């Protein structure tokens, strides 16, 4: 993994910082493991904008990732590491001994030729997946399930991980990078190690066009608008003189949006405390 600061041959390259991984495969993905990824432009089925700041973007295919890791006791070998435009982490193409191929998240330290396996009694080794009731306390894990059999939902971005800190009866306690501590069923599966490509956070796009390639449109400040367009608009100077609100007058910047209080009992320590 190399971090390259571009030469200032143009204003767009002056501040750009790229993350280059020479070990990534440069060919096309496996055709049986991709599907169409259509663009919405932030519009719903009526053609109305429901999410702002979305539009454009380079064409891309969605890579079908195996988040469940439920093919038990069949050893697999890492064929190659690939770039995935749909996520910050890289992905690994694995070949099972029965000939089946799947994409998984590339763990930190996973290399071409590495051998991995999933199962209840899998070895505690980078890339292996098993239920958390069989994982030692203090182990760093990622791709953690919230509901058994649903597939990993926690710690999937580049450089993220979760630490297993205790086990009690049929539940385990994990600590997230955000500081949140919560309980999960011990039957939930997780993958050993942390997600790779942690250097992706050091990437600097360098120019507005690089955001447009990713489908991100400009975000205009409310204070820069007219009163007809935004509650913060108009007036002299930059002060809008009221509590921050959305373009529709709803409270923002600090307003709590969590609705599912039913699962509050599983959270021991909130990330905001």
From Swiss-Prot:
Composition skew (Basic residues), residue ranges: 253-263
A biological process term (GO) from this entry: cytoplasmic translation
GO molecular function, one term: transferase activity
Keywords assigned by UniProt, alphabetized: Ribonucleoprotein, Ribosomal protein, RNA-binding, rRNA-binding
InterPro entries linked: NA-bd_OB-fold, Rib_uL2_dom2, Ribosomal_uL2, Ribosomal_uL2_bac/org-type, Ribosomal_uL2_C, Ribosomal_uL2_CS, Ribosomal_uL2_dom3, Ribosomal_uL2_RNA-bd_dom
Chain intervals for the UniProt region annotation (Disordered): 221-263
Pfam family name, one: Ribosomal_L2
Gene3D superfamilies per the UniProt record, alphabetical: 2.30.30.30, Nucleic acid-binding proteins, Ribosomal protein L2, domain 3
GO cellular component term of the entry, any: large ribosomal subunit
Family according to the record: Belongs to the universal ribosomal protein uL2 family.
HAMAP family documented for this protein: Ribosomal_uL2_B (MF_01320_B)
Subunit structure: Part of the 50S ribosomal subunit. Forms a bridge to the 30S subunit in the 70S ribosome.
Function description: One of the primary rRNA binding proteins. Required for association of the 30S and 50S subunits to form the 70S ribosome, for tRNA binding and peptide bond formation. It has been suggested to have peptidyltransferase activity; this is somewhat controversial. Makes several contacts with the 16S rRNA in the 70S ribosome.
Protein name: Large ribosomal subunit protein uL2
Source organism: Buchnera aphidicola subsp. Baizongia pistaciae (strain Bp)
């Amino acid at each position: 993994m190399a971090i390259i600061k571009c030469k200032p041959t143009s204003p767009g390259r002056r501040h750009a910082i790229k993350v280059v991984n020479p070990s990534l495969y440069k060919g096309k993905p496996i055709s049986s493991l991709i599907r169409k990824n259509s663009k919405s432009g932030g519009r719903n089925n009526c053609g109305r904008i429901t999410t702002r700041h979305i539009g454009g973007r380079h064409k891309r295919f969605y890579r079908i990732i195996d988040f469940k890791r439920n093919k038990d006791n069949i050893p697999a070998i890492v064929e190659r590491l690939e770039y995935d435009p749909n996520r910050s982490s890289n992905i690994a193409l694995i070949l099972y001994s029965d000939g089946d191929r799947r994409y998984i998240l590339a763990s930190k330290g996973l290399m071409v030729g590495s051998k991995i396996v999933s199962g209840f009694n899998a070895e505690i080794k980078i890339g292996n997946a098993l239920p958390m009731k069989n994982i030692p306390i203090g182990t760093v894990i990622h791709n953690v399930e919230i509901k058994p059999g649903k597939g990993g939902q926690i710690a999937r971005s580049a450089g993220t991980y979760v630490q297993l800190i205790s086990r009690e009866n049929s539940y385990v306690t994990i600590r997230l990078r955000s500081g949140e501590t919560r309980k999960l069923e011990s039957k939930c599966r997780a993958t050993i190690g942390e997600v790779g490509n942690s250097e992706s956070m050091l990437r600097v796009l360098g120019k507005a066009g690089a955001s447009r390639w990713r489908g991100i449109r400009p975000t205009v400040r409310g204070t820069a608008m007219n009163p007809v367009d935004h509650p913060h608009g108009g007036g002299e100077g930059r002060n809008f003189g009221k509590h921050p609100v959305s373009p529709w007058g709803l409270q923002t910047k600090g307003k709590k949006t969590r609705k599912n209080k039913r699962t509050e009992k599983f959270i021991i320590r909130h990330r905001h405390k």
